[in-house]
Amino acid sequence: MSEKELFNVTIVTTGGVCEKLIPYVARVTRGFDMRAISAPFVSKSQQEKDLELLHKLLRYKHLSVFEFSSIVFQIECPIYVARQLMRYRCSSFIERSLRACGPMESDEAYFAYNDAIKAGQKREDARALLPLSTQTRFLWSLNLRELLHIAEERLTPNAQAMTRDIVQKMVDLTSEHFPHVIEYWQSDRVIGYWKEYRKDSKCPTK
């Protein structure tokens, strides 16, 4: 991460899981005798059926099957942003100790914060000048269902800017490993938190 960047997001691992696992899990719940998940698609028609099922699962919000696919992210960002992300407890975190972070002159930060407020900056952004803006690094393990839930809440115009940018980057990176999941989810996202903004705002991920 360069000195000019305020955050960085990378994928550490997806555990070798691919999109084929999701329709597999869905069919297991119906008692079907399934082919090995590691095998290639049997035919184009079978692949089309899998993708159609994947789309239906998202459209009708049968989301429990997405809990079987997990991703581990490494995120670097200010502490105050990390704390917003760590409110989502259906996931696992491990964070770098503050003892590994350099010191910051609190008096200087305090005066800079007051100057920013007087200049009209929002408090939610001006607090980046306080010691809580110290950079931290953490690993975040979560399943696809939780990731989509977080994106529904944080990819909205009223979300804190850097938190929204981080979640956007997480979605972008996830699309490289689960392209159809993200594509179908974006195309159908006129539900949940997006209803409120559908008329006035464009989806940030479009």
Task: Show which residues each predicted segment covers.
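Family-specific signature for flavin-dependent thymidylate synthase
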Residues: 1-206
